[in-house]
């Protein structure tokens, strides 16, 4: 296993702890005497004006549309690297996690739709339980240390990357508002410029970021969700260059700490603050949180494991070396940790929704993700060899 991958796993595991702390802090603030201050902080207007350009949004939307675009830039870089030289670089390597990812998105979406089919406004949240939070999932897996086979970690990483691709496609197709053709034309021109730079071998990252900023503003104004600009820029950064051995890896390594220790925790802090005032068991059992909770905790493992098992039995794919189906099932439960990615989709699905869909969706995400994390950890622990525990008791 490469040093790059080892560093990535360690970083994502540490990020999971900070994410939990940020989410817990948000919950405490939202349910304390500081709740109004917490909400006022998120509603703080932030305006950027350059000549005729004027962007005026509350801080919450700057976090969701701006900072998360940087996170999706990192996702684009990771996906491209894995497709060119990593876990998705060959058909044999990519087939198993790709099939698992498809099953892991379909089953939760169907379960959610089953509970909310009669409510047109609530149906907009069908994709919420389809996402996986890679930082949390890898963080839980990291608690078991060296007992976890490397091939199992690679499977989870590859599956999560394929899952991210699916989320990107879902956002582009289903959560796009009314389009502005003028802004869209500027976005297309910026994309073509990035493609031209890539084709001619341009490896100055600063130039890509400059054109990428133009693309982000254009996409923001066009009605397409602005985070997609980050994905496009990520795909356009060249893997090999002259100034750097790999501009893509150089930028990826530079962005990882910012994403892991600032962007995702800040997003969690801004979106996880659910007020529990007036929320009881009946609230949790209402269609939106119930659909999300069961989609994550039941639908994810059902979809991932069932499709994985069938693909192996039918000879379409093969199990990673050193991995058994008990471990695949445990990982499939961990895939139900939707947290930040599910909350991101919820912020799009219910951006203009009425009632308490936003709060209810976050409640379902928190409960479903927590159940998936706890049960997934226990299932994985029981499925793994106990050699590390044996070694740790030798000196006692």
From Swiss-Prot:
It is a multi-pass membrane protein. The chain crosses the membrane at residues 14-34, 59-79, 95-115, 124-144, 154-174, 178-198, 205-225, 254-274, 278-298, 328-348, 363-383. GO terms for cellular component: plasma membrane. Its main location: membrane. It catalyses: Na(+)(in) + 2 H(+)(out) = Na(+)(out) + 2 H(+)(in). Keywords: Antiport, Cell inner membrane, Cell membrane, Ion transport, Membrane, Sodium, Sodium transport, Transmembrane, Transmembrane helix, Transport. It comes from the Bacteria. It is found in: Cell inner membrane. InterPro entries: Na/H_antiporter_dom_sf (IPR023171), NhaA (IPR004670). GO terms for molecular function: sodium:proton antiporter activity. One of its GO terms (biological process) is regulation of pH. Belongs to the NhaA Na(+)/H(+) (TC 2.A.33) antiporter family. Na(+)/H(+) antiporter that extrudes sodium in exchange for external protons. This is Na(+)/H(+) antiporter NhaA.
């Amino acid at each position: 296993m490469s040093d790059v991958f080892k560093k990535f796993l360690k970083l994502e595991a540490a990020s999971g702890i900070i994410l939990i702390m940020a989410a817990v802090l948000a919950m405490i603030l939202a349910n304390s005497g500081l709740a109004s201050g917490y909400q006022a902080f998120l509603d703080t207007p932030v305006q950027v004006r350059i000549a005729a350009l004027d962007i005026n949004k509350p801080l919450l939307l700057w976090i969701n549309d701006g900072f998360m675009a940087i996170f999706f830039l990192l996702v684009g870089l990771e996906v491209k690297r894995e497709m060119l030289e990593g876990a998705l670089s060959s058909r044999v390597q990519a087939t198993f996690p790709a099939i698992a990812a498809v099953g892991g998105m379909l089953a939760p979406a169907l379960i959610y739709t089953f509970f909310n089919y009669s409510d047109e406004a609530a149906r907009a949240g069908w994709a919420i339980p389809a996402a996986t939070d890679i930082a949390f999932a890898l963080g839980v897996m990291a608690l078991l240390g060296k007992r976890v086979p490397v091939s199992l970690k690679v499977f989870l990483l590859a599956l999560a990357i394929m899952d991210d691709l699916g989320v990107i496609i879902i956002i582009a197709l289903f959560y796009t508002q009314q389009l502005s053709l003028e802004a869209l034309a500027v976005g297309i021109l910026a994309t073509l410029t990035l493609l031209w730079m890539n084709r001619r071998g341009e490896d100055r990252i600063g130039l890509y970021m400059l054109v990428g900023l133009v693309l982000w503003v254009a996409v923001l104004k066009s009605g397409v969700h602005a985070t997609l600009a980050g994905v496009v820029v990520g795909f356009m950064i060249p893997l090999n260059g002259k100034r750097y051995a790999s501009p893509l890896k150089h930028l990826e390594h530079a962005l990882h700490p910012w994403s892991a220790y600032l962007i995702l925790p800040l997003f969690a802090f801004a979106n996880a603050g659910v007020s529990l005032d007036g929320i009881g068991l009946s609230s949790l059992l209402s269609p939106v949180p119930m659909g999300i909770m069961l989609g994550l905790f039941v639908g994810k493992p059902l979809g991932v494991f069932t499709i994985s098992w069938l693909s192996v039995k039918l000879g379409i794919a093969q199990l990673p070396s050193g991995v058994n189906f008990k471990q695949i099932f445990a990982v499939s439960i961990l895939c139900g940790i939707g947290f930040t990615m599910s909350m991101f989709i919820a912020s799009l699905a219910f951006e203009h929704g009425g009632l308490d869909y936003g709060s209810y969706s976050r409640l379902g995400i928190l409960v479903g993700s927590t159940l998936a994390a706890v049960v997934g950890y226990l299932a994985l622990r029981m499925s793994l060899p106990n050699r590390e525990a044996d070694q740790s008791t030798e000196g006692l």
